[in-house]
């Protein structure tokens, strides 16, 4: 983290504060700017979390979608920190600077949920606009939606992921389904990892397994 902090401070021109790993989430929208040397030659770059089971990503992020949009979120209501795609260009890599509060966010130790919506998830899920809600900082959701409104970028928001602990989830040959009906781009383990205790961690991850509200099963035997 010290190396990342030093790099970010040098590139941004002010001292950043990254005292604990979760603080890195605030910096996700700036990764294209901070790590530009790593993404040279690529048309797009992405951010993700480590508590993710991926499905068939390219089944959702198609060439047609990439051709039309500069930013892709896997929720309909806010920019998703757990997974998002950015076009590798100056406008997108520097878009985070459009926030009136990015210096405040990056220089203070507090985690602001800048990559998403400043913790306003519940209000947005209820259908409110981010611009109707009083927030502590101008989050990346604010920034992206403003840029879309001003015709600076094209962004795609769609509910493509699974979250929570609904059960009836099945991973099968690189795809992930709910109730054998709805396919998702990924399953975010944010809530599941809080309620289960692994028993046996397999050396090789099977090609098929099921996920209940509290366990992961393979051939009806708990594997994690």
Show where each model-derived region lies.
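Active-site-proximal specificity loops/subdomain of glycosyltransferases
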Residues: 1-40
